[in-house]
Amino acid sequence: MALTPRIAIDAMGGDVGVRVMLAGAAMARHKHDGLRFILVGDEERIKAALDNHPNLRAASDIIHTDGVVSGEDKPSQALRKAKSTSMGLAIDAVKRGDAGGAVSAGNTGALMAMAKLALRTMPGIDRPALAALLPTLGDNDVVMLDLGANTECDATNLTQFAVMGAAYARTAMGLERPRVALLNIGTEELKGTDEIRDAAALLRGAEGLPMQFAGFIEGDKLSRGDVDVIVHDGFSGNIALKTIEGTARFVTDLLRRAFTSSTRSKIGFLISRPATELLRHHLDPNNHNGAVFLGLNGVVLKSHGSADAKGVANCVHLCAELIEKDITRQVTEDLANFRRGDAA
């Protein structure tokens, strides 16, 4: 039975502001009519923004606070004022069971710290991972994790990330046996750090899990679609993600310059417009907005700080989907099966 998709929205987090966050929530509700919301933040500003979205207003409750986590706040600073901030109260709604999940565009480090403290990690997990779906040249997206929550990881962390990432791929993409690979500097077994090689050995020996270990993958193959899940520490993963995002912006800007450089180029753009619009859609990060913290006893998603309303809507829709498909139960069961197999 599907869980009730009620989502707590940190209306004050990120660079986008209350109006964009609520416009995104309203767009998500148009696609997903059963959605309900808890909007957390400055009540006066929230009510003013809701004037433009009567459909959202009818489906929302408001928790007032004027406390905000800034982008400059360290996790330790954010934790000290968690109970008085929009981010902290949104997560607390998940902890109490009032919401099935939370969405914030705020400070990633603070969000991780607050979510871990409030929701706690699943049995056997000491480090949640930040996972996102990214486009590929294949038929499916690829799950990449960790994207910055943990800068240093040992072999056990990486194997747990692999199990959680595979569960996410099955839940979000409907894959029966996702192909899982470890990001490395080469595909040979002797390449990479001790942690990566040890994680590979553990994954090769894992039995009975609904996943396929595909070995190592190099950075130039991330978007080919050869695998469904790519595992790495948060330091490497964040660099890889920012490189992908930067390359997408570079290609988009390059095309814009090329097609506006002369009259002939502008005519060429009109002829090739359907193809260029398809490319722009594929490269637009708003179409893949939303990273989930895996390994927590609850659903918490991070929206890009500069996402537009469409991007926020996609993040909210993903949150609702993960609540309905009970991603928390799926990850918990897979981790338990992995531990049993590892102990056998």
Curated annotation (Swiss-Prot):
Metabolic or biological pathway, per its Swiss-Prot or TrEMBL entry: Lipid metabolism; phospholipid metabolism
Principal localisation: cytoplasm
GO terms under cellular component: cytoplasm
Reactions performed catalytically: a fatty acyl-[ACP] + phosphate = an acyl phosphate + holo-[ACP]
EC number in record: 2.3.1.274
GO terms classed as biological process: fatty acid biosynthetic process; phospholipid biosynthetic process
Keywords linked to the UniProt accession: Cytoplasm, Lipid biosynthesis, Lipid metabolism, Phospholipid biosynthesis, Phospholipid metabolism, Transferase
Transmembrane feature ranges: none
A family per Pfam: FA_synthesis
Subcellular compartments: Cytoplasm
GO molecular function, one term: phosphate:acyl-[acyl carrier protein] acyltransferase activity
Subunit relationships: Homodimer. Probably interacts with PlsY.
Stated family: Belongs to the PlsX family.
Role summary: Catalyzes the reversible formation of acyl-phosphate (acyl-PO(4)) from acyl-[acyl-carrier-protein] (acyl-ACP). This enzyme utilizes acyl-ACP as fatty acyl donor, but not acyl-CoA.
Name the record gives this protein: Phosphate acyltransferase
Source taxonomy: Bacteria, Pseudomonadati, Pseudomonadota, Alphaproteobacteria, Sphingomonadales
